[in-house]
């Protein structure tokens, strides 16, 4: 039998108090509706180093979104020194715990570090976690570079 809502005039005072307490508890339980993400993902292009495979690119990433990110991945475009797109690839930054800074390194096979003139964050291909919207990982991304290579979105 489906449950029915009763008009408040039919509830006793104790019943109304019990309903108010239950509603308050439900709103504070994990998994209840959460506030939208308000912070940022700070992504720094830290270094490009020659490696046995080609070029190793290092990023420092800080999750300041106010919640854990179960998975973040970005589509990256590499441009040569002449400004031409050399390749598109997806870099999976995996899990990013809230208020944690991590270093992520990626080996780019057959890439010449010295030939890379610009790294563009084209889009977020994955943005997963409780309370996150699909576009949060790109909209709230702050990109900086310690390298001579131009980096941004």
Short names for language-model regions:
Residues 74-76:
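Hydrophobic beta-strand segments
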Residues 110-153:
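Terminal connector regions
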């Amino acid at each position: 039998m489906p449950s029915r809502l009763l008009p408040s005039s039919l509830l006793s005072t104790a019943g109304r108090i019990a309903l108010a307490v239950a509603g308050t508890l439900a709103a504070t339980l994990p998994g209840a509706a959460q506030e939208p993400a308000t912070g940022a993902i700070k992504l720094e292009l830290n270094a490009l180093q020659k490696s046995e495979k080609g070029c190793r690119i290092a990023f420092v990433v800080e999750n300041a979104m106010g919640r854990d990110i179960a998975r973040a991945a970005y589509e990256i475009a590499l441009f040569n020194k002449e400004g031409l797109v050399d390749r598109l690839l997806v870099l999976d930054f995996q899990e990013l715990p809230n208020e944690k800074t991590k270093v992520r390194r990626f080996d780019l096979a057959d890439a010449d570090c010295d030939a890379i003139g610009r790294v563009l964050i084209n889009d977020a291909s994955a943005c997963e976690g409780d309370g996150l919207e699909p576009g949060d990982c790109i909209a709230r991304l702050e990109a900086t570079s310690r390298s001579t290579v131009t980096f941004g979105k």
